[in-house]
């Protein structure tokens, strides 16, 4: 019996020892939890500042944490809440991570304030992105940009325009693509998916009547107010002094939170270290407070290409890259190069990507030109109504195709024969469609300048030009010009078209590598182009008359020249700033990569340009329905039409004159006469020597800035090993100006 009692006492002592050890373990565990909970109190609001933190918990955990934020939003609710039981805490879901807001033995007072939330995506917010964006910007129009991929796995692209920027989203369905576009638009000016999360991130619950979806100006004093420590509440009087100090320190970080939101105002410029090579930092020093907006973010990770945009001095610059950081750098570099002529070391100049032209807009430009051609050729014979190459220049206000207007139209594929050269400027040397369209566009520009000669104010207000205070004229805001060509321009752009390599593949690739990017010349009285030969840059008059082949530069090279010098030419440079193309639309034989390389990238070595001149990089696009190839010989004539002119002019491409033998309205002689009538009566950008120049060549050389930029371009071609720009005999420009 004694042994039984002894064993009972021994087992009782062992049991009591185990209980004591268990209590000590629980006590130590409770202390560790207290420390972790206090630390998380201050770190939780700043978790969103770390870009590397991602949330991988399931939907149950997400909903539990969201409910937890709502429960802990009001401090008064925390004080009146009974502490959770230990069994419930142990039996709860492991993903809940619920912290005890009250501590036993402390009079039921608040020990610590725990702010815990998950980084909600737009798709799980109380209001999805479409609803939020509709409330902020009602009446937005979503349009389907494209549909790519196989039939069983399509990829849709939907775009929406918000605040002057176009955001494009992609997805396996139109609904998801539309949702993605709305998310990108919201992220450009909203940081948090809902009001609750925004308030909690800034240290307080939402005030009464605050609507996060209303205009920003409606709640500057509630949502974005300065966060001061609140007055002590009765329920917090018994809190520990250390907790109050920690809470005060957390509130002291309010400015960091405001900067993270980036909604209160522009961020201060970050000082760059000497020799800073980061274009984003340098641009921020020059223009503080810039915001970068993500315009496109593909859904497929293996083909990521982000597009970021930044607005500087009222102009929008865009860049693309495999990450948002690289895209921001490209956009910043584009702004630095365009506005400040700054080229950062280690950054390829001019490769910042612009937003692709909407396919619907490109198709509308093509349809406008082809429809206008059918309209103006209805009274012509079938022989004159056909064309092998068609070109036109369309004027728009912004990228609104509804207000588009065709201002110049032409056709043709031939050049003048050398025996028909004129030393009085009475012939048109190059009758290719693109070149004739540009000369018809000069006719249109002269008409617009002549409106400023009228004494009636309404006439000058109808002009596309406005007068500058410092002298001269410039285009009105949002006036854009677009070139449409039915086939890829002759020269290097057409040579490397993927549809034209039909011979042996190995020899074709070798030819491509050898002559890639070279300047090319047209064949006299024929079609096609050949690379420039020899270092000679000037042809001789007597040599051409004796049978030497007349050399004319290709259309590809001429368009590349327009992208630096402008469409207006030397004479009009006396009056107007350079006029550049906004876009080029090609109907067939089109390859965007090759076209971009020969149109823009060959000019990267030109260097810094004078004010108002730039390296223009027009938007490039094909059309949805490419024009069919037209076999047979090209017509031996060229047609041109200009808005405001009732008659349609037909030029014999071999002689460079009208069919009746008279000079064309687009020849040097006629256009220079219009210039002479304007000179001295209109304000000029160049210093006037007094008297009107007597000769055509003197008038052209008088545009000193234009001539210096032209020489700069020609030297860049030579330095890059692309060949020498061949000029016509100088005798062609040595004729007297007539009024």
From Swiss-Prot:
List the InterPro entries hit by this protein, alphabetically.
Answer: A_deamin, ADAR3_DSRM_1, dsRBD_dom
A Pfam short name:
dsrm
Q: What class of enzyme is it?
A: hydrolase
> Where are the stretches annotated R-domain (ssRNA-binding)?
23-35
Q: Where is the A to I editase domain?
A: 408-735
Q: What is this protein called?
A: Double-stranded RNA-specific editase B2
- What is the organism field in this record? Homo sapiens (Human)
Q: What are this entry's molecular-function GO terms?
A: adenosine deaminase activity; double-stranded RNA adenosine deaminase activity; double-stranded RNA binding; metal ion binding; RNA binding; single-stranded RNA binding; tRNA-specific adenosine deaminase activity
Name its cellular compartments: Nucleus
- Signal sequence segment: none
């Amino acid at each position: 019996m004694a042994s039984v009692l002894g064993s009972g006492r021994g087992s009782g002592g062992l049991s009591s020892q185990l209980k004591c050890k268990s209590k000590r373990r629980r006590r130590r565990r409770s202390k560790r939890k207290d420390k972790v909970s206090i630390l998380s109190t201050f770190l939780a609001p700043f978790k969103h500042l770390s870009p590397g933190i991602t949330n991988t918990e399931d939907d149950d955990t997400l909903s539990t944490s969201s409910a937890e934020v709502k429960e802990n939003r009001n401090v008064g609710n925390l004080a009146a809440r009974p502490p959770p039981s230990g069994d419930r805490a142990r039996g709860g879901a492991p993903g809940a991570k619920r912290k005890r807001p009250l501590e036993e033995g402390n009079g039921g007072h608040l020990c610590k304030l725990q702010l815990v939330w998950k980084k909600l995506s737009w798709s799980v917010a109380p209001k999805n992105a479409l609803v939020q964006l509709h409330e902020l910007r009602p009446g937005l129009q979503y349009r389907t940009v494209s549909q790519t991929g196989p039939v069983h796995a399509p990829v849709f692209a939907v775009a929406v325009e918000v605040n002057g920027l176009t955001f494009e989203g992609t997805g396996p369905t139109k609904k998801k693509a539309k949702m993605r576009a709305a998310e990108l638009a919201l992220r450009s000016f909203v940081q948090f998916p809902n009001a609750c999360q925004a308030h909690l991130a800034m240290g307080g619950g939402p005030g009464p009547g605050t609507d996060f979806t209303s205009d920003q100006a409606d709640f500057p004093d509630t949502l974005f107010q300065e966060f001061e420590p609140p007055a002590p509440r009765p329920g917090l009087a018994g809190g520990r002094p250390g907790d109050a100090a920690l809470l005060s320190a957390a509130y002291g970080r309010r400015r960091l939170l405001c900067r993270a939101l980036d909604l209160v105002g522009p961020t201060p410029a970050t000082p760059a270290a000497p020799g800073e090579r980061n274009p984003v930092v340098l641009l921020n020093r020059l223009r503080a407070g810039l915001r970068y907006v993500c315009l496109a973010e593909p859904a497929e990770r293996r083909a990521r290409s982000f597009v970021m945009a930044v607005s500087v001095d009222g102009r929008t610059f865009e860049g693309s890259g495999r990450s948002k950081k690289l895209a921001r750098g490209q956009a910043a570099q584009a702004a630095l190069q365009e506005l400040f002529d700054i080229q950062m070391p280690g950054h390829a100049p001019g490769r910042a990507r612009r937003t692709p032209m909407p396919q619907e807009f490109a198709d509308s430009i093509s349809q406008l030109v082809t429809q206008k051609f059918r309209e103006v050729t209805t009274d012509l014979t079938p022989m004159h109504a056909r064309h092998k190459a068609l070109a036109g220049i369309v004027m728009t206000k912004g990228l609104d195709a509804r207000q588009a207007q065709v201002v110049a139209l032409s056709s043709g594929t031939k050049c003048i024969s050398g025996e028909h050269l004129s030393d009085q400027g009475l012939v048109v040397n190059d009758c290719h469609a693109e070149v004739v369209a540009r000369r018809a566009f000069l006719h249109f520009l002269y008409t617009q300048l002549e409106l400023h000669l009228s004494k009636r104010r309404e006439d000058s207000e109808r002009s596309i030009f406005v007068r500058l205070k410092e002298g001269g004229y410039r285009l009105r805001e949002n006036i854009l010009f677009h070139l449409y060509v039915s086939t890829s321009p002759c020269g290097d752009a057409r040579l490397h078209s993927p549809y034209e390599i039909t011979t042996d593949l190995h020899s074709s690739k070798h030819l491509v590598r050898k002559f890639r990017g070279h300047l090319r010349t047209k064949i006299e009285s024929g079609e096609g182009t050949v690379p420039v030969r020899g270092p000679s840059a000037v042809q001789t008059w007597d040599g051409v008359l004796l049978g030497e082949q007349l050399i004319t530069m290709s259309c590809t090279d001429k368009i590349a020249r327009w992208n630096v010098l402008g469409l207006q030419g030397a004479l009009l440079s006396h009056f107007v700033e350079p006029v550049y193309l906004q876009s080029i639309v090609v109907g067939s034989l089109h390859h965007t990569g090759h076209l971009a390389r020969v149109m823009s990238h060959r000019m990267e070595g030109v260097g810094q340009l004078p004010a108002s001149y730039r390296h223009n990089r027009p938007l490039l696009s094909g059309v949805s329905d490419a024009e069919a190839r037209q076999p047979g010989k090209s017509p031996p004539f060229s047609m041109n039409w200009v808005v405001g002119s009732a008659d349609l002019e037909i030029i014999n491409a071999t002689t460079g004159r009208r069919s009746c033998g008279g000079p064309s309205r687009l020849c040097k002689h006629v256009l220079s006469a219009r210039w002479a009538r304007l000179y001295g009566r209109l304000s000029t950008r160049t210093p006037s020597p007094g008297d009107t120049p007597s000769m055509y060549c003197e008038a052209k050389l008088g545009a000193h800035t234009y001539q210096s930029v032209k020489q700069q371009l020609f030297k860049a071609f030579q330095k890059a090993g692309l060949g020498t720009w061949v000029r016509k005999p100088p005798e062609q420009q040595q004729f007297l100006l007539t009024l």
